[in-house]
């Protein structure tokens, strides 16, 4: 998932969205 979609992608999950190298990750201790 790209940076632009990251906040919506991670919404509703107990996660903090972060973006590295144009890749979205929802940090829950695991990489998404």
UniProtKB/Swiss-Prot annotation:
SUPFAM superfamilies: Scorpion toxin-like (SSF57095)
Compartments where located: Secreted
Matches recorded under Pfam families: Toxin_6
One GO location term (cellular component): extracellular region
Disulfide bonds: 3-19, 6-24, 10-26
InterPro entries found in the cross-reference section: Scorpion_toxin-like_sf, Toxin_alpha-KTx_8/9
Tissue and organ expression note: Expressed by the venom gland.
Residue ranges crossing the lipid bilayer per the database entry: none
Domain of life according to the entry: Eukaryota
Record's keyword terms, sorted: Disulfide bond, Ion channel impairing toxin, Neurotoxin, Potassium channel impairing toxin, Secreted, Toxin, Voltage-gated potassium channel impairing toxin
One GO molecular-function entry: potassium channel regulator activity
Primary location group: secreted
Role of this protein: Blocker of human voltage-gated potassium channel Kv1.1/KCNA1.
Note on domains (UniProt): Has the structural arrangement of an alpha-helix connected to a beta-sheet by disulfide bonds (CSalpha/beta).
Family: Belongs to the short scorpion toxin superfamily. Potassium channel inhibitor family. Alpha-KTx 09 subfamily.
Protein's recorded name: Potassium channel toxin alpha-KTx 9.4
The species this protein was found in: Hottentotta tamulus (Eastern Indian scorpion)
